Amino acid sequence: MLSKKFGLSMIVLGIMSSSAFADSIVEGRTLNVAVSPASPPMLFKSADGKLQGIDLELFSSYCQSRHCKLNITEYAWDGMLGAVASGQADVAFSGISITDKRKKVIDFSEPYYINSFYLVSMANHKITLNNLNELNKYSIGYPRGMAYSDLIKNDLEPKGYYSLSKVKLYPTYNETMADLKNGNLDLAFIEEPVYFTFKNKKKMPIESRYVFKNVDQLGIAFKKGSPVRDDFNLWLKEQGPQKISGIVDSWMK
């Protein structure tokens, strides 16, 4: 059985050798990549300013196997998505959620991670959510452009649990978590990998108050109609669930 972190059960690919794809699709090419490195451990910067993370390791490994190069450009989150949607970039990755809205302008790889959304507070801010009706008592924030807005708009708002107009939006998770720490925000929406990074690696005293389990999938984004997407899916299949999960798990520790 595939682990929840490797959602490749629905891959359906035509029979085509990896060498045929490599020779005709990406071998010798330089792929333009758009990133927004503010979603650890999917993509972020080390203390010395170097890009690192799950997404970079995955796509660099793919490119190494296919003998291509990466030309990486940093953007704000919306700019990153706009770059790949417009064709300015061939690829985008930074822990990008696969959504129906985005699929209208972007092609996605098969998901490599089945994601959960956490509502977190500072540990000393004793918030108990017995049910979602209590959400309206609290301020909620998260980085702009994230898939949490879809969850609120399509699920929480119609049920009267929370209004999208009440959400506080921030440039990145860093600003979101800073406001949470400073007491200017009650709850932050934060995805599972980022939650464990802040809690376990950055030692931020936060606690989960509610979990929306397995509501999200992360994938690599490609410009519409790109054959590179199909080759990347083939590469994922070649690696197998165990190897991909091993890469993901190594960044979660």
Swiss-Prot record:
Disruption phenotype: Does not affect growth in vitro but leads to decreased growth rate in macrophages. Decreases survival in host neutrophils. Decreases virulence in a mouse infection model. The keyword Protein biosynthesis does not apply. Changing M146 to T/A: Additionally binds methionine. It is found in: Periplasm. Monomer. Belongs to the bacterial solute-binding protein 3 family. This is ABC transporter D-alanine-binding periplasmic protein. It comes from Salmonella typhimurium (strain LT2 / SGSC1412 / ATCC 700720). The lineage of its organism: Bacteria, Pseudomonadati, Pseudomonadota, Gammaproteobacteria, Enterobacterales.
